[in-house]
Design a protein with these regions (language model features):
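N-terminal Rossmann-like NAD(P)+-binding subdomain of aldehyde/semialdehyde dehydrogenases
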Residues: 1-75
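Rossmann-like NAD(P) dinucleotide-binding subdomain of oxidoreductase/dehydrogenase enzymes
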Residues: 66-164
Length: 164
């Protein structure tokens, strides 16, 4: 279970993803240019932003995820971050890497798994992102693209939110 994997291992996976993003930056930029007409220079900046985000969470996740203790005059409260399970993300087309990474990285670092519906006109980018996650040491099925319609998303949410 991914939610039981320690933070250090999750961060190791994230660090591997940083390496892939850096190594394949030009390829991913060209893919965005091909699929959606984004200028290559803007696409490169988008990948740089994804790298920055990954590095930011790599450096700060331990602090973000540790328990917070709040004292008021009457009581002491502890806020604990806990995984929720499978999180569905529905992404637009205009920033096909950035929108996914800003959602997926903190979601994954917090111990959740991801189902991601990408926009239908950037499915090559969606596939490339899935490969980035798969090339890290993440266990299988921590990140999964789903290719479904908006109507099917409604059915998925309805079916998955029912108590078992």
């Amino acid at each position: 279970n991914w939610n039981n994997v320690d933070l250090e291992f999750r961060l190791d996976c994230l660090n591997e993803m940083i390496g892939v993003l850096k190594d394949e930056k030009i390829e991913y930029s060209r893919l965005m240019a091909f699929e959606m007409g984004k200028p290559v220079s803007q696409a490169e900046s988008e990948i740089d932003k994804c790298i920055w985000l990954c590095e930011y969470y790599f450096e700060n996740a331990s602090e973000f995820l540790k328990d917070k203790i709040i004292n008021d005059n009457a009581q002491k409260y502890i806020i604990t971050i806990q995984p929720l399970g499978i999180i569905l993300g529905i992404m637009p087309w205009n920033f096909p890497f950035w929108q996914v990474f800003r959602f997926a990285v903190p979601t994954m670092i917090a111990g959740n798994t991801i189902l991601l519906k990408h926009a239908p006109n950037v499915l090559g980018c969606a596939k490339a992102i899935q490969q980035i996650f798969e090339e890290s040491s993440l266990p299988n099925n921590c990140y999964n693209n789903i290719i479904i319609t908006h109507d099917q998303v409604s059915l998925l949410i309805k079916n998955k939110s029912q108590p078992s």
